[in-house]
Amino acid sequence: MEQNKQNVGFYGGTLGPWLPMLAMITLMIISTATHTGGLNRVVLIAFACLALGFFLCKDKKHYGGITLKGLTNPMLGTILMAYILAGVLAQLMRQSGIISALIWAVTKAGLNTGFLPLIAFVVCMLISTSCGTSTGSVAAVAPVLVPLAASLNVDVGLMCGAIISGAIFGDNLAPISDTTISSALTQEAELGDVVRTRFPYAALSAVVSAGLFVWFGMKMSTGAAGALNLDGSTAKSLVLLVLPVLMVIMMRKGWDLIATLITCDVLGIVLNLVLGCIPLSKMLDGKGPVVAGMSGMMILVLYVLLLFQMLEILNASGAFENLNAGLLNMCKTPRSGELVCFLAASLGSFATGGSGIAILFFGSVVRSITKTFGIDRCRGANILDGVACGTTGLMPYGNPMLVSLGVVMALEKADPNFSFMNVIPYTFHCWGLLIIFLLSILTGIGRRYEEKKPVA
């Protein structure tokens, strides 16, 4: 079976298997630029590109079986359930009246709304560093702060960018993050050394990002929270803020994301009923938080199902292996070797849909390059992880972006044309990681070499 998987042929030579994915990204950008974006259009694009793969595949008779293998990826079930359960949590929070309560609290505190993006960034930094998960951090914070931003006339794209940036910070730096662990293991480096040497890059990007969030926050918000006239009748719903806190604690204690979300959803239902925020009749209604939360994520679920089938095209055709071999042939000097590591991490993330798989898949390539030129193994781990995480935060089909878009589309007055293009310009920390590591590679700043052990 493995041999058949590797021998699936596509018209177009080595570029053939990549054409559906490249076409999807191109069409998504065009759709957004022409104001015909949104998740509904993205699903149509994904379907069209999956069909393109069918016409490019030489073995059309078995194309369905080939692509359906992508749905056996163990990550898929976790991702889909996380979206659905996060959708329920978002609706439980929204329908409880917590947004009005938060606006009331902001009004009473006299807080300038321009600081909300910075607050979102810092909160997500703390959560993701504590839990080591970007998706979980976005799922915990976005359902609360995105609707709040929309209600206070803070740019929603800016708020999503702040949330994603904070989530990527911890995913890249936290010692318990899967990407941190994977990058250290694949590069044969000590985890403590990796975190220690990685911190200056992450900290520099975070400081610059924080300044940008303050500047853009002040520029793109009215700062008029104090002018709102609310009576605080929904203040009791502020008790539900215990849910994102509980998420952080549970994930920090080692609970997986699905178990954590189920627990928080159930507790959210109980709290809403006990506090009287949502009556039982509405809770059981078709427009209630449970049904609305699940159904609101269905477009996202459909897109991910199509996406994983498209990713399987790259696996079945051997496109990943060909890319691996091609990258190795490009290395001539330490600088070019590190540039190839940069390229492998970024292309790998785009091709696999996330940083975790890319690091595991291309880790051996990066380690082979760093060994060849005697580059410090921590240096390889930091380039691999920093670039992969930064790229994932920018990807239109990356988990952090998709969760954020799902929350935005669930807003009461959501802009049907809102898309990833409204968010990408403001994911400052993601851009920062990519720029800082690229400059480090080009200038040689931070490049260290392995100490040669004396011959006995």
Residue ranges of model-derived segments:
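Juxtamembrane and boundary regions of transmembrane helices in multi-pass small-molecule transporters
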Residues: T34, S165-A167, N172-G232, V239, ...
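Hydrophobic transmembrane alpha-helices of multi-pass small-molecule transporters
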Residues: M1-L80, R198-Y303, L442, G446-A456
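Alpha-helical transmembrane segments of multi-pass membrane proteins
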Residues: G114-I127, N153-F169, S336-S349, F373-L394, ...
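Juxtamembrane helix-boundary/capping and inter-helix hinge elements in multi-pass membrane proteins
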Residues: K58-K61, T72-L76, N153-G157, S182-V195, ...
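Hydrophobic alpha-helical transmembrane segments of multi-pass integral membrane proteins
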Residues: L80-V88, L111-V144, L328-S368, T372-F373, ...
